Amino acid sequence: SNDISFKFDKFDPNGKQLTFQGYASVLDTGVLQLNKVGTGLPKEIGGIARYVAPFQIWSKATGEVASFVTSFQFFLETSPNPANGASDGLTFFLAPPNSPLRRAGGYLGLFETSNKSDSSYQTVAVEFDTVGAPANTWDPGYPHIGVDVNRVTSIKTTKEKWNKRYKREVANVWITYQASSKTLTASLTYPQDQTSDSVSVDFKANLPEWVSVGFTGGTTVGGRETTHEILNWYFSSTLEYQT
């Protein structure tokens, strides 16, 4: 079967089920840290962590496309002053298994400097953008959840109130893809409120048959350095016939 399912209640610093690029690593506390902060690091700091085994998201032979569900918890650790806000965000992504770590900072490790659509990326991501700054001309100008398809400019964004989120408040994320309707839905829940949105994405048109799945995180040095930390992760995908 090309179906896949896994669950991490926490992460093992010595485990073999994740691969890393850039500044991503598992801490001794069992937390998956997507990027570091500190002195002696580049201005833009990023990292990727992905599940070690690629899986089939669609089949050219049968026409099947996978539906999936994933859930995880994350929090933002800001320094030196949480009142300054956070930067730049994290993503949950599907991409080619050998895709590189690209530009960090506001590009979140998935894309290069151009915000033009580029089908060679073969990447679909849900981004949790904590900045949305006007300086990032591709962003809507406010912090947001966005869906990215082969470009850093989201095809749809939903405003998120990240203020008051910088003191290790835990976010609960639930993301689903329904193959029959090509509907990608992302839900972000904090103790006080919930944000969710859905958008149509054609996986066959935008992803290779086999993909890897994981997370990226990125921050920019300059007073709002943030580590993006994943506490746990569940993922399950099933190939099914298109209706």
Curated annotation (Swiss-Prot):
The keyword Manganese applies. Ca(2+) binds at residues 129, 136, 139. Gene3D superfamilies: 2.60.120.200. One of its GO terms (molecular function) is metal ion binding. Mn(2+) binds at residues 127, 129, 139, 144. Glycans are attached at residue 115. The keyword Calcium applies. SUPFAM superfamilies: Concanavalin A-like lectins/glucanases (SSF49899). It holds the Pfam family Lectin_legB. Keywords: Calcium, Glycoprotein, Lectin, Manganese, Metal-binding. Belongs to the leguminous lectin family. Homodimer. This is Anti-H(O) lectin 2. It comes from Cytisophyllum sessilifolium.
